Amino acid sequence: MTHKERFFTAIHHEEPDLVPVSAGLDMKFVELLTGKKAAKEMGAHHGGGLEEGRTVSPLEFHEANLENQRLRFEAIQRLGTDLYSVSDYNIYPKDYVPKMLDDRTYVDFWGKIYRLAPEVNTNYWIDGVIKSEEDLDKFVPPDPEEMNYDIVDLAVKLAGDQYPVVGGIHLAGMFPYLIRGGLDKYCRDLYLNPRFARRLTKMVGDVQLKIAINVIDRGVDAISESDDIAGKDGPFYRLPIFKELIFPYIEEMVRICHRHGITYLKHSDGNLYPILDALVALGIDGINPIEPQVMDIADVKKRYGQKVYIQGNVDCTWILPFGTEEDVRRDVRRCIDAAAEGGGFVLSESNSMHPNVKFENILFYVDEARKYGRYPLRR
């Protein structure tokens, strides 16, 4: 089977030749796998082109993103995994470059503020620009028709008919609280100034929905909607808030995906159990990553495996960063034993192959998946 055939067989709840394997690689590992130097990385949130104390042009920033996307494809080929992803973090307005506020701090076109951390080759979110209704009144959101989708076109071209291209997108579940300056502020708004929270959420959701539609129109094979809406203690909001503000965008995106014949994977870290029935009822096709510290992948497979495919959940909090080879291999087997029977399963890490993961553990992860994840499964 090709990688694409393997993926589609699995997500349609049939058994392929092998369990499909996904790995969300930090650029650190892309460099190690390809032996090539990537453009200066901005972590998960942009493809490259920025570094401390240096100004880059829009063209240089864009070309850095495209080159890093090419290297990601070469890396998955060398690693032997099955899914090729492209993120909406690398879709931005034409002639855009993040605005540097100082040598280490920048703001993106959505008003999310990040701090560069060159010592660990990544960045992290710190704030947002919308502090009041007056700020929202003045804010000009990006135009979905004026965005640069070159990176999606490149991914689809490179993948051809061999690899499935998964478009990573965001809707209304996460960007509003990042732009607002924090989940705590956004939650206060929901109760003390709900009109403000609703306006902000609608502004973001409407734009991101149109961006996602444009990504679909460029030929991706699946959508992975990546809004984190829960923590280890449970969902961020009560179910009525989800139903009013967040779920309508998911439901509409599911309809659009199905109209185009592609699948919709819902990603969120944290404990989703309190809202999982409601999420599945929206018509989503898959759930990821089923965080192992707070959710049981075998239980999720048993309860929901006839309706959704399962993607997860080798532990990237402890085992992949700190575990031994046998720890990694054992955790891969745990996931396959729990969820792979009958298809409907894609093996992945429980969030990402972040910079603190040990490189050799990524190799053990894939090797064990290929050895143990051969259908018919061994018991």
Predicted regions mapped to residue ranges:
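Generic structural marker for isolated residues within well-ordered, non-membrane alpha-helices
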Residues: 72, 103, 297
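Short acidic, Pro/Gly- and aromatic-enriched capping/linker segments at domain boundaries
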Residues: 88-105
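Short linear loop/turn motifs
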Residues: 73-74, 90-93, 335
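Acidic, polar-rich N-terminal leader regions of halophilic archaeal proteins
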Residues: 13-14, 78-79, 90
